[in-house]
């Protein structure tokens, strides 16, 4: 029998689809990468019996990046990134080994059916999958079609089975539009980001951002936030005056009346009107009206509206809301959550979707009433031609989902029910009064039929007292007329919901990328999220936007990105040439980049006002090896050391604490060592600031601390403190942390493995001797006599932490969130692989300390 390979976008989706198509009769096993499962079953395809293999990827298989040497910031002019720097497709997550996994599963298959998400990104992933599997599949006979695309909008039996019977082809134009967007964002973003990051971090010490990034979508998004901030700052409150009248009915009921003039900004004029009315005793009814009005039911739900409500009503950030929606979709609770459409298709089964909710404990009564009376025809919205609106696909309870997932599901379901409910109808009563020469009005609303507000109570018409019955010519007693002094108020900072609306209006980003752009400006420390999910720009965000406006406003205005998005959509529709759009857009931004570089002094003037130069920032910490003066430690991101005398800046490890290391000095350059620590339970290691930035040996790279330094005699180096190969990763070496006592630690110098050992020992030292079994360095341990774990109250022991049974009970391995005793091999580990420094995969360097240290040192300088 022939074999059909089917590929979904996520492992959970693959399992759900396979379960539906196989009717639960399938076998499953983990793939070679450990992340994706393979589900097998037999069935029919193209009228013949076949073997089906259903598996998945984990999002994008490949990512776009520059060739190796162009990723070195210090050696490449950012201007070269626009055209001269070649790009290549790399595996998005090398640890998953996705290409090899797809090739193994695709080898010998005859057909491939692509079940990737039905959007532009999904089409792009289709071709990434095809690039991996087509070369290893069986050759087609007589031009037989072998590549198929399944299109679906929800994970339901009906939708999946229908998709399987209506297979089509992947859309190459949509995939190309994604390639174009990726390349534009990479080249433009990297060029501007590298230039401004290097320029400003080399001059200012309190920017508090490790990366001063620029993005064609990210920067206009920030621009909206700063524009609102500028309006708030430039706002000047004005005083105005309002007349307020209170009248009484015969039954002593009081009514507050609104002045028809609303307000006046001249006190004398307001006082004149007050004088003309305050002595009047009666208010005359000049007109009454009663009108029936309707509040429209909502349009069908699309992504942007869902994100707006999630932020404003549920308090969820757009990124978080989108992640929850995707999880609900993959679990089959809602339809595909990325859509711009607000109009149900003509063949959409509204009654069927509604019946699924008929027994729900929260809204069963409303649904049953709707089904009995007949559903209302939904409003005609916008049909973007992508996916149906977001709807619930099955009933779920709060106990079943819980937390934010339930809150979002509840809103989606209530919104769906509301779209097929009736409009809310209410009666609006208005009475017009005259007090002296001035006119006042009183309004009231009475609900006739709640309609959709019964299922969406937060949308209900505000309750107001009903107005008394009266007619033209009636009089009411004037209780008082007073003048109120008020002031105009500035607008508030943008909420996430308002920002999403602005981005949609100006065409910045897509329904899928809008949450990413908002999340980026938060992570870059350009804005902070205040109460009410309002976005307040930071000093850095404000200065950047003002600088862009000063140099080239189009870098921050939404117009140019909106035009680019339209061109990308034309590529997706097959109406524009990929290479022409790419070349034209890059040429425009290349010119803008050169002008930006030439005019950077304009932004620098703004930076000078808001931020402190490096020399005036930070606190003295360690001595420079060149001038022997104190260097200043700048704690703000990115943390670094700056010598104002030599005008040199040295980068440091991030996301930890830095302190002076016992005033010890590096034997190579005389710089004082500093100690980096990620916390009491994490890693820590000393480093030389100069060696960290300028590696002294050929086998070292920039960013290596003393725990990776191969100096043969330095007491802090890998050569003196290295023990043996890491138990988890291929290239790492476990190194003793000499600063960790009395709670001693051994940590890998590459991955996050930390072994806690020998608590309360007086002294731990790496011996020159090695283990006969695994060739790891032995440890000499001197225990506290009162707390010695050794038999016979002995205090000293020398052994191997991998092989010595005494030490094995005293060593606990930690990495990520797991911990376990450190044994060689063991369940779940790569059994059979040596843990010592003598057993290594072929081609791996041997990190043993050199026996002939002087020969080794000489070898470095030859």
Swiss-Prot record:
Residues 820-855 are annotated as: Disordered. It comes from the Eukaryota. Highly expressed in testis. GO terms for cellular component: condensed chromosome; DNA topoisomerase III-beta-TDRD3 complex; nucleus. The keyword Isomerase applies. Gene3D superfamilies: 3.40.50.140, Topoisomerase I, domain 2 (1.10.460.10), Topoisomerase I, domain 3 (2.70.20.10), Topoisomerase I, domain 4 (1.10.290.10). GO terms for molecular function: DNA binding; DNA topoisomerase type I (single strand cut, ATP-independent) activity; RNA topoisomerase activity. It catalyses: ATP-independent breakage of single-stranded DNA, followed by passage and rejoining. It is an enzyme of class 5 (isomerase). CDD domains: TOP1Ac (cd00186), TOPRIM_TopoIA_TopoIII (cd03362). Residues 821-851 have a biased composition (Basic residues). Its EC number is 5.6.2.1. Residues 3-153 form the Toprim domain. The active site is at 336 (o-(5'-phospho-dna)-tyrosine intermediate). Keywords: DNA-binding, Isomerase, Topoisomerase. It holds the Pfam family Toprim. GO terms for biological process: chromosome segregation; DNA topological change. Residues 171-593 form the Topo IA-type catalytic domain. Releases the supercoiling and torsional tension of DNA introduced during the DNA replication and transcription by transiently cleaving and rejoining one strand of the DNA duplex. Introduces a single-strand break via transesterification at a target site in duplex DNA. The scissile phosphodiester is attacked by the catalytic tyrosine of the enzyme, resulting in the formation of a DNA-(5'-phosphotyrosyl)-enzyme intermediate and the expulsion of a 3'-OH DNA strand. The free DNA strand than undergoes passage around the unbroken strand thus removing DNA supercoils. Belongs to the type IA topoisomerase family. This is DNA topoisomerase 3-beta-1. It comes from Mus musculus (Mouse).
């Amino acid at each position: 029998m022939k074999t059909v390979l089917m590929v979904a976008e996520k492992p959970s989706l693959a399992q759900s689809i396979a379960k539906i198509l196989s009717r639960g009769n399938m076998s499953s096993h983990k793939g070679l990468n450990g992340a994706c499962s393979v589900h097998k079953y037999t069935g029919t395809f193209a009228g013949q019996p076949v073997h089906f293999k259903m598996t998945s990827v984990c999002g994008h298989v490949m990512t776009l990046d520059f060739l190796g040497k162009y990723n070195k910031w210090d050696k490449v002019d950012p201007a070269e990134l626009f055209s001269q720097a070649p790009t290549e497709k790399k595996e998005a997550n090398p640890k998953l080994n996705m290409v090899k996994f797809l090739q193994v599963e695709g080898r010998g298959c005859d057909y491939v059916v692509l079940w990737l998400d039905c959007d532009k990104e999904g089409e792009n992933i289709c071709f990434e999958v095809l690039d991996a599997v087509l070369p290893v599949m069986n050759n087609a006979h007589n031009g037989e079609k072998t590549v198929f695309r399944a299109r679906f909008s929800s994970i339901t039996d009906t939708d999946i089975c229908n998709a399987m019977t209506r297979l089509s082809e992947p859309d190459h134009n949509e995939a190309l539009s994604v390639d174009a967007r990726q390349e534009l964002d990479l080249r433009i973003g990297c060029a501007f980001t590298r230039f401004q990051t290097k320029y400003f971090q080399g001059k200012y010490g309190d920017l508090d951002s490790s990366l001063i990034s620029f993005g064609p979508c990210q920067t206009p998004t920030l621009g909206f936030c700063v524009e609102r901030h500028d309006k708030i700052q430039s706002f000047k409150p004005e005083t105005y005056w309002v007349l307020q009248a209170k009248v009484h009915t015969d039954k002593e009921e009081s009514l507050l009346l609104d002045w028809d003039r609303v307000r006046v900004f001249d006190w004398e004029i307001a006082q004149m009107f007050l004088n003309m009315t305050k002595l009047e005793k009666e208010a005359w009814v000049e007109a009454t009206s009663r009108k029936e009005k309707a509040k429209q039911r909502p349009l069908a739900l699309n992504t942007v509206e869902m994100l707006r409500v999630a932020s404003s009503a549920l308090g969820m950030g757009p990124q978080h809301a989108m992640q929850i929606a995707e999880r609900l979709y993959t679990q089959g609770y809602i339809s595909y959550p990325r859509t711009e459409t607000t109009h149900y298709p003509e063949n959409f089964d509204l009654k069927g979707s509604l019946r699924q909710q008929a027994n729900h404990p929260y809204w069963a009564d409303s649904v049953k009433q709707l089904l009995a009376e007949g559903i209302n025809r939904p409003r005609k919205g916008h049909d973007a031609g992508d996916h149906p609106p977001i709807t619930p696909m099955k009933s779920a309870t709060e106990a079943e989902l819980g937390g934010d997932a339930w809150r979002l599901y509840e809103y989606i379901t209530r919104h769906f029910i509301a779209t097929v409910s009736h409009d809310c109808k209410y009666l609006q009563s208005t009475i017009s009064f005259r007090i002296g020469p001035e006119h006042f009005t009183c309004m009231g609303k009475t609900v006739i039929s709640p309609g959709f507000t019964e299922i969406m109570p937060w949308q209900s018409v505000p309750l107001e007292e009903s107005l008394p019955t009266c007619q033209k010519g009636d009089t009411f007693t004037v209780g008082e007329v007073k003048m109120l002094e008020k002031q105009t108020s500035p607008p508030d900072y943008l909420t996430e919901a308002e920002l999403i609306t602005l981005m949609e209006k100006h065409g910045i980003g897509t329904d899928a990328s809008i949450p990413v752009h908002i999340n980026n400006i938060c992570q870059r420390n350009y804005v902070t999220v205040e109460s009410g999910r309002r976005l307040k720009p930071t000093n850095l965000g404000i200065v950047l936007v003002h600088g862009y406006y000063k140099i080239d406003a189009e870098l921050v205005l939404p117009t140019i990105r909106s035009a680019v998005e339209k061109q990308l959509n034309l590529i997706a529709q097959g109406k524009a040439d990929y290479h022409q759009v790419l070349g034209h857009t890059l040429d425009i931004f290349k010119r803008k980049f050169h002008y930006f570089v030439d005019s950077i002094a304009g932004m620098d003037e703004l930076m000078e006002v808001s931020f402190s130069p490096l020399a005036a920032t930070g606190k003295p910490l360690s001595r420079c090896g060149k001038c022997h003066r104190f260097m200043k430690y700048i704690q703000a991101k990115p943390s670094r050391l700056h010598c104002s005398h030599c005008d040199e800046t040295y980068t440091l490890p991030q996301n930890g604490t830095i302190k002076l290391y016992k005033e010890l000095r590096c034997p190579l350059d005389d710089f004082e060592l500093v100690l980096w620590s990620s916390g009491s339970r994490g890693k820590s290691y000393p480093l030389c600031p100069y060696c960290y930035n300028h590696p002294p040996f050929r086998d070292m790279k920039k960013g290596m601390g003393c725990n990776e330094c191969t100096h043969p005699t330095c007491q802090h180096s890998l050569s003196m403190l290295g023990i043996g190969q890491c138990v988890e990763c291929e290239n790492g070496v476990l190194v003793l942390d000499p600063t960790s006592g009395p709670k001693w630690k051994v940590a890998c110098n590459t991955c996050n493995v930390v072994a806690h050992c020998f608590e309360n020992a007086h002294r731990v030292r790496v011996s020159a001797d090695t283990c006969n079994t695994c060739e790891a360095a032995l440890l000499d341990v001197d225990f506290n006599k009162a707390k010695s774990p050794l038999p016979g109250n002995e205090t000293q022991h020398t052994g191997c932490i991998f092989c010595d049974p005494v030490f094995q009970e005293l060593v606990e391995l930690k990495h990520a969130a797991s911990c376990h005793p450190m044994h060689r091999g063991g369940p779940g580990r790569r059994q059979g692989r040596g843990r010592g420094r003598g057993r290594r995969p072929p081609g791996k360097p041997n990190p043993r300390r050199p026996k002939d240290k002087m020969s080794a040192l000489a070898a470095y300088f030859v």
